[in-house]
Amino acid sequence: MKRALLVAMLLAAVTATGCGTVAKQGYYGVTGASGRYYEVKSLGGTTALDRYPSVGVEAFDPSPMLGAVPPSLAGLVQAAVVNKLVETKMFSSVAKGAPAAGGLLIRGKFVDFDPGGSALRAVGFGVNPFLSAQIEVVDTGSNRVLGIAMVTGTVQSAVRTGTTELADGVGKAVKGLVEQHHTERD
């Protein structure tokens, strides 16, 4: 009797774990990559970026990673950050490269990258692909660095993978940082 109860409990535990993995994969398959940020040098309060009407995004520098970051990733991240900042509707102008006069410039360099790719990820094992960058938010009028942050995009889905998803995750992280310090919407 005790053995049957133990087997039933173990079977329930194994089955429940699998259901949780499937549920998580379904969720991340819908939501895509996630982004997070950590401020190394704070931008200031919740209205610190309100006075800037425009923002420009430089292509992030892959050279610190000594060839580990695919060259195409710099352009994908730049485009993803621009798209996410356009979504915020907080700036009258969002551009690749230099912003309009009196705007903000977001520039960065890649500092960590793991493409993942393990087939074991589909069943809950292995490392999730991630891409991290150190960014600076610069006042172009004074060329002063207003803040520094670490931004990371992580792909937790076994279905939606690849460099485009990682770039989108980094874009979400930058968007979150800007939304934390900008209250006005154009």
Placement of each model-derived feature along the sequence:
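Compositionally biased, intrinsically disordered linkers/stalks adjacent to structured regions
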Residues: 153, 159-186
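Short, histidine-centered active-site or binding-site loop motifs used for metal coordination
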Residues: 59-62, 151-155
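Sec/Tat-exported extracytoplasmic proteins
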Residues: 64, 77-92, 114, 170, ...
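Sec-dependent bacterial lipoprotein signal peptides
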Residues: 1-19
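Structural recognition of the beta-strand scaffold that forms the well-ordered cores
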Residues: 56, 147-148
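Surface-exposed short loop/turn segments
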Residues: 21-31, 88, 92-145, 152, ...
